[in-house]
Design a protein with these regions (language model features):
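Sec-dependent N-terminal signal peptides
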Residues: 4-15
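Patatin-like phospholipase
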Residues: 18-58, 66-328
């Protein structure tokens, strides 16, 4: 009886604080290897004792966000970025062919183990992304979170339906497949089939999903933007990488996408709507800057950018807490 009273007393003391605390959402943008900077932001939030209630991610942001939602700490994610052989994972490199200058297997040509994309072939990409999907599945299985429903933190994964050019937000089902879809760059990776849809990189339409966090119920949204220039949601040179989608969109659809660039207008709107906008300084990094040294440098950049805005975040949490707990 005495033990029960102690538990009830503790619960009653904690509930008012929880009720008055604003819900914090974290919007993690895409940017390939630059996603390591997002790990630096998570490290600062953990050190400051700031709990994240909702996460939305696009492309590499979905990988970081999904694994964090599954229970991986920032320190564990740092180890992953610094030690994982990302190039082999992402390119489906066959280690058994490392010493083979040219080898064709099942219609795919490999150069020293790396699959080569035939620029004249029609299709969406030669790389299946199977290896990265397997690794993610193994990682989330260790934490007991193979699907969205079992995650420790509510999470949304942003993808693009390549047939309709519509944004698709995944919130249930198999986690590893959703994460694979969100980082499937058209023309490089094969799309993921999901409930009758063909899904690819969410960054094509929403590379900074602040709006998704807001829809989840966040009072405060922290956005981590990995873009490094004012007009960079998708560089002009990246258009070559999406040429494969012409098979389903049609040439007219591709030209319309390139002309209207719906991702840019949404990107700037989401930037404006973010309560805390974190923009790590990564001038010499690009989406392929994997490796231990690069990861370490980008994690530090994310840490520095987050620490700079930590006082603003604390003040916002304090002010919002007073607003949330104030009597009606």
């Amino acid at each position: 009886m005495k033990k029960m009273l102690i538990i009830l007393t503790i619960a009653m003391s904690v509930l008012p604080a929880m009720a008055g605390r604003p819900k914090i959402g974290l919007a993690l943008g895409g940017g390939g290897a630059k996603g390591a900077a997002e790990v630096g932001v998570l490290k600062v939030l953990e050190e400051a004792g700031i709990h994240v209630d909702y996460i939305a991610g696009s492309s590499i942001g979905s990988i970081v966000g999904g694994l964090y939602a599954a229970g991986y700490s920032a320190s564990e994610l740092e180890t992953m970025f610094r030690t994982q052989e990302w190039l082999s994972l992402l390119t489906d490199r066959k280690a058994s062919l490392n010493n083979e200058p040219f080898k064709t297997i099942d219609g795919v040509t490999y150069v020293f183990g790396f699959p080569v994309i035939d620029r004249n072939s029609r299709g969406f990409g030669v790389m299946s992304g199977g290896r990265i999907e397997q690794v993610i599945d193994s990682m989330v299985s260790v934490k007991g979170c193979t699907d969205f429903e079992s995650l420790k933190i509510p999470f949304r994964c942003v993808t693009t339906d390549i047939r309709t050019a519509n944004e698709v937000i995944l919130s249930k089902g198999v986690l590893c497949k959703a994460l694979r879809a969100s980082m499937a760059i058209p023309g490089i990776f094969k799309p993921v089939e999901h409930n009758g849809r063909l899904l690819v990189d969410g960054g094509m339409l929403n590379n900074l999903p602040v709006d998704v966090c807001r829809q989840m119920g966040a009072d405060i949204v922290i956005a981590v933007d990995l873009q490094q220039s004012e007009q960079q949601p998708r560089k002009k040179s990246d258009i070559n990488a999406i040429s494969g989608i012409a098979d389903l969109f049609g040439l007219g659809g591709i030209l319309e996408w390139i002309t209207n660039r719906p991702d840019i207008s949404k990107y700037y709107e989401n930037r404006k709507q973010a309560d805390i906008y974190i923009h790590p300084d990564l001038p010499d990094a690009d989406a392929s800057s994997f490796g231990n040294k690069n990861a370490a440098r980008m994690i530090l950049a994310g840490t520095a950018a987050a620490r700079k805005l930590l006082p603003d975040l604390r003040a916002l949490i304090s002010n919002t807490s007073q607003s949330v707990s104030a009597p009606m």
